[in-house]
A protein has these predicted regions:
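Pre-Walker A (pre-P-loop) alpha-helix and adjacent loop at the N terminus of AAA/AAA+ ATPase modules
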Residues: 93-133
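Walker A/P-loop nucleotide-binding motif
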Residues: 127-147
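Loop/turn-to-beta-strand initiation segments
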Residues: 159-160, 190-193, 222-228
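Short glycine-rich substrate-engagement loop in P-loop NTPases that contacts/grips substrate
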Residues: 111-120, 128, 151-191, 203-210
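A short, basic N-terminal segment
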Residues: 1-107, 269-287
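Walker B catalytic acidic pair
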Residues: 198-199
Length: 287
């Protein structure tokens, strides 16, 4: 900081004569410069003129102005992040019901959910090592909910995730030219995590198997993790019926650690609760 000499002070006092102060500012008699009433910091400084003699007194920001600016920028960044997450959820969770697949909505009945939480907690390591999951087991045992909880939790952390299924993918590919299909499949690599739900429900036509292979192989080559859910048994995946299935399943088994879902049918349990609620409604009497 420049020492305020008598010469400089005279220049400061001359400049101060015509200055307009804001309501939270005052001129400090000690140095003649503009200060903040709140923090007492300088809002004016003394700078030597470059290349010639003399000085000028530009405005500067005080501590509380600096903090206010940092808070404003932080608030703007939070807003941008929220909007970005909202867009990513709209893109990554293509079915609205998936928004409800969250850890907050977990009823605690499935002990495997601890593994879902662990996957999220160790996501950086999983991503670095291209570690995926293969969730297999009977219908209604919570595989999709497990995967959806991971998807929502990572999306909330601003991680790009896509949760989809092969019928949806194949429907989108129908009618596309070869170049467009390649671009569409390559677009999956924009997501740090790709979740394919219900592998095995799609029709096993030659065209479908070829496109499924392209999707899985593209993901395999990108070295980015994927999570697969399926009602198929592990033995079926390890002993595929033909070469077309083998090419797909081998890549999945290499990249995805298998987790067996062999508990109760939660979907049937929920359906029973729904039936009871409906029964209570239709049998109730108005007063």
């Amino acid at each position: 900081m420049i020492e305020i000499t008598a010469e400089i002070r005279a220049l400061i006092d001359k400049a101060a004569a015509g200055v307009e102060l804001a309501g939270d500012e005052y001129i400090d008699p000690a140095d003649g410069l503009i200060h903040c009433k709140k923090c007492g910091g300088q809002r004016q400084t003394v700078v030597p003129c470059f290349g010639k003699s003399g000085y000028f007194m530009p405005r500067c920001i005080c501590q509380c102005q600096r903090e206010a600016e940092e808070q404003r920028k932080a608030a703007e960044e939070r807003q941008r992040r929220m909007e970005r997450i909202k867009r990513r959820k709209a893109q990554g969770l293509q079915d609205r019901y998936l928004y409800d697949y969250t850890f907050a909505n977990d009823n605690g009945k499935n002990p495997l959910m601890d593994k879902a939480r662990a996957y999220v907690e160790n996501w950086k390591e999983a991503y670095k090592n291209n570690t995926g999951l293969l969730l297999f087991g009977d219908v209604g045992t919570g595989k999709s909910f497990f995967a959806g909880c991971i998807a929502n939790a990572l999306l909330d952390q601003d991680v790009p995730v896509l949760m989809t299924n092969f019928p949806t993918i194949l429907n989108r590919l129908t009618g596309m030219f070869s170049e467009d299909r390649s671009e569409f499949i390559a677009s999956f690599d924009e997501y740090d995590l790709l979740i394919i739900d219900d592998l095995g429900v799609e029709r096993s036509t030659e065209y479908a198997m070829e496109q499924m292979f392209f999707v899985i192989d593209s993901r395999y080559r990108s070295r980015r993790p994927m999570i697969i859910t399926t009602n198929l048994k592990l033995a079926e995946l390890k002993n595929p019926p033909d070469l077309a299935h083998a090419r797909i399943y081998d890549r999945i088994l290499e990249r995805c650690a298998p987790i067996l879902f062999d508990g109760k049918n939660f979907r049937e349990e929920n359906a029973g609760a729904t039936r009871q609620t409906a029964k209570d409604i239709v049998n109730s009497k108005q007063d």
